[in-house]
């Protein structure tokens, strides 16, 4: 357990290092901590903090820098809240405040997180079943039919079907009316199962067309399963902490390209109550010691449907990132709830 003096020195050291990116020495702490302590006394306290694994000494400097464990103690017990909502509101958040297509809201959110943090913004796409609200067939020409799929939230997808039979427009209207009367509101898979039972009762050509529509709908859903939107990866190239460490840079870009590990981490964060912070490799999922993740779930009508966050160096302004993530999660939830309403 640290005494108040040690806590204050650790807090000051972390804040100075976050601000400057340079190892912090005892003289700097003596001037900025507000404690009337000699540099010698401060050196003794720093030695104790180092033994506890809270700070470390780079080989090239007499100063100290925080470790992941030191950052964790700082985040858990030393942050203070400051007003930040107006900066978010005044920095391009307007698109998020408007009900819009979910894809556009999610893309805007990732860009907003990246813009405000100057790091990487990530947002998982809302989880939803592959339900359709309306389906329509239009004749394009001989043996070519346009299938229009409309989801409950207004997303529209078009697919061209190449058919073995040349359907008239009246046949297509008949199939459209039947599908919408009997299957609207079901998932694509639900429609498939119902058709298996009912296809014999339908005229052969119409049944075949409906089966083709279900197959096209399945393909459309599978193509539209991008689960994670990432924005601002290149921002990390300008972070001095990574310097010319090509190994770390390569790992980072593999992480953003493959997305699997990030999705596992963010899915775990969806069960958190508010903002959650992973420092360095402590998540066990993102295997990069130099990266931290600040994340929070977002809700639609009281139900958690996704997670968003900021990914940056362990030397980040955690207080600021927490508020960026917290406020953005609320903006996204509001925009999506209004859209569904």
Swiss-Prot record:
Keywords: Repressor, Stress response, Transcription, Transcription regulation. GO terms for biological process: negative regulation of DNA-templated transcription. The keyword Transcription applies. Pfam families: HrcA, HrcA_DNA-bdg. SUPFAM superfamilies: GAF domain-like (SSF55781), Winged helix' DNA-binding domain (SSF46785). The keyword Transcription regulation applies. It comes from the Bacteria. GO terms for molecular function: DNA binding. Belongs to the HrcA family. Negative regulator of class I heat shock genes (grpE-dnaK-dnaJ and groELS operons). Prevents heat-shock induction of these operons. This is Heat-inducible transcription repressor HrcA. The lineage of its organism: Bacteria, Pseudomonadati, Pseudomonadota, Betaproteobacteria, Burkholderiales. The gene is hrcA.
